[in-house]
């Protein structure tokens, strides 16, 4: 593909040792050479670095620089690329960029370098999204997941599914179009059914395991619930190790939901401390209680706090019922006091004495199936778009199974199989994708 040569600052603006300006395109080397005093860049080898100066229009020195040259196709974009390391001040970096643009080079749009890498075949769409995930990662495991995708572990998994679906389509099409072909396998429903079923089993396994990688990438919506004054806010503060929520002996002091984030052994929890659920005494508290119910409904993990020093109350029983079908950990707080609670808890802690918190953290990872992670656990899908497309492919394969059950013609199967194949291709970006690229790459920073 032929594109205009583009440039942008690739490092954050600010005072630093250096800033880097990236230039990519057919004229990258020749245009930069026009304003560079040093070696003739048109004659240097790829992957070399050169000292010199960027010159003003009148020939005076604008800045002392180091220039890295990457000749196509051995660059990130598969185009000629020049990276100019300038001094790291805001003004000087902007001035050097302006000087580059004066040569006729265009200012890059956000994400345009990564977009070119995709369009030129350097990376697929999954890898492009992985670059953004690395930039925005909030924990070490999220970086591991993104690096797996960047190194094609995810792409290979989807390619394998695509290949199996395509083989099935091809064999069915041969039966339809060339029934006289002696070597063609006769694709009866008895032969098609188990192969589609195997594909569905494989997809279901990927979706199940992808829930864990999605937790790692995006964090886990975790709601702390309990009746008033059982220690919810104290638990939040203990996990955060800071006074984030209001802690008081007065029932109902947390009148709204409070959000905070904590990194727990490579997994980010979005902690939501809710208002205690009871019969609210005023309008403001009622709003907080209503939001608590909504938070429970939307939560991926519920930390239900009970008071070990008191017997089970009506409010406790209501919360146990309200959360029984959720991913839930029942926590007994105030283990430093005599216990009167009649039911078993998963974990016993004392937020006052800071006891049992490490046990709780281990229980959280175990409940989310994020304990004892091994290298292959980071291979699965974590991106919402990928998971949605895989679910759509699954739906199409289920339509094939349904068509078989209703004894429909074999050519009907090919239609749904083709849809499944297209949905898998959309994950990688090698099928039709409309405005997806513009939307996706616009989320990148300029120098990417």
Swiss-Prot record:
Q: Can you say where in the cell this protein is located?
A: Cytoplasm
Q: Which GO terms describe its cellular component?
A: cytosol
Q: What does this protein do?
A: Exhibits a very high intrinsic GTPase hydrolysis rate. Involved in the addition of a carboxymethylaminomethyl (cmnm) group at the wobble position (U34) of certain tRNAs, forming tRNA-cmnm(5)s(2)U34.
| A Pfam family of this chain | MnmE_helical
GO molecular function annotations of the record = GTP binding; GTPase activity; metal ion binding
Give the binding site residues for GTP: 229-234, 248-254, 273-276
- Name the major location: cytoplasm
- What does the record's cofactor remark say about binding? Binds 1 potassium ion per subunit.
HAMAP family reported in the protein's UniProt record: GTPase_MnmE
Keywords assigned by UniProt, alphabetized: Cytoplasm, GTP-binding, Hydrolase, Magnesium, Metal-binding, Nucleotide-binding, Potassium, tRNA processing
> Which GO BP terms sit in this record?
tRNA methylation; tRNA wobble uridine modification
Record's keyword annotation contains Nucleotide-binding: yes
Which cofactor does the UniProt annotation name? K(+)
The residue ranges of the TrmE-type G domain are 219-369
Protein name in UniProt: tRNA modification GTPase MnmE
Q: Per UniProt, where does Mg(2+) bind?
A: 233, 254
- Family named by the database record: Belongs to the TRAFAC class TrmE-Era-EngA-EngB-Septin-like GTPase superfamily. TrmE GTPase family.
Task: Name the positions where (6S)-5-formyl-5,6,7,8-tetrahydrofolate binds.
Answer: 22, 83, 122, 448
> What Enzyme Commission number(s) does the record list for this chain?
3.6.-.-
């Amino acid at each position: 593909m032929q594109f205009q040569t583009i440039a942008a600052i690739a490092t954050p603006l600010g005072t630093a040792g250096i800033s880097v300006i990236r230039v990519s395109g057919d004229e990258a080397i020749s245009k930069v050479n026009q304003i560079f005093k040093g070696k003739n860049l048109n004659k240097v080898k790829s992957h070399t670095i050169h000292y010199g100066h960027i010159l003003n229009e009148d020939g005076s020195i604008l800045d002392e620089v180091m220039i890295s040259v990457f000749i196509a196709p051995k660059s990130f974009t598969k185009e000629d690329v020049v990276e100019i390391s300038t001094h790291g001040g805001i003004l000087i970096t902007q001035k050097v960029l302006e000087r580059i643009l004066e040569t006729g080079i265009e200012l890059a749009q956000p994400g345009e370098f990564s977009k070119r890498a995709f369009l030129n075949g350097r990376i697929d769409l999954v890898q492009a999204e992985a670059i953004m995930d690395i930039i925005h990662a909030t924990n070490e495991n999220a970086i591991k997941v993104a690096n797996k995708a960047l190194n094609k572990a995810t792409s290979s998994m989807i390619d394998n599914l695509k290949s199996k679906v395509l083989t099935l389509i091809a064999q069915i099409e041969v039966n339809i179009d060339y029934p006289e072909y002696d070597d063609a396998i006769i694709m009866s429903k008895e032969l098609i059914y188990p192969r589609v079923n195997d594909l569905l089993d494989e997809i279901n396994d990927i979706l199940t395991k992808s829930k864990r990688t999605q937790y790692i990438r995006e964090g886990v919506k975790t709601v702390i619930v309990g009746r008033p004054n059982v220690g919810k806010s104290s638990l939040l503060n203990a996990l955060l190790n800071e006074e984030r929520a209001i802690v008081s002996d007065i029932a109902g002091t947390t009148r709204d939901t409070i959000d905070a984030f904590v990194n727990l052994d490579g997994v980010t929890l979005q902690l939501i401390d809710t208002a205690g659920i009871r019969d609210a005494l005023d309008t403001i508290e009622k709003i907080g209680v209503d939001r608590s119910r909504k938070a429970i409904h939307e939560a991926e993990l519920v930390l239900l706090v009970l008071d070990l020093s008191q017997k089970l109350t009506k409010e406790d029983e209501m919360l146990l019922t309200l959360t029984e079908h959720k991913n839930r950990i029942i926590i007994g707080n105030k283990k430093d006091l005599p216990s009167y609670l009649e039911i078993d808890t998963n974990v016993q802690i004392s937020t006052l004495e800071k006891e049992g918190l490490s046990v709780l953290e281990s229980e959280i990872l175990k409940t989310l199936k994020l304990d004892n992670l091994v290298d292959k656990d980071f291979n699965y899908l974590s991106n919402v778009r990928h998971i949605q497309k895989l679910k759509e492919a699954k739906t199409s394969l289920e339509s094939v199974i349904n068509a078989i059950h209703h004894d429909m013609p074999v050519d009907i199967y090919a239609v749904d199989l083709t849809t499944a194949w297209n949905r898998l291709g959309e994950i990688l970006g090698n099928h039709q994708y409309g405005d997806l690229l513009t939307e996706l790459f616009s989320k990148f920073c300029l120098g990417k």
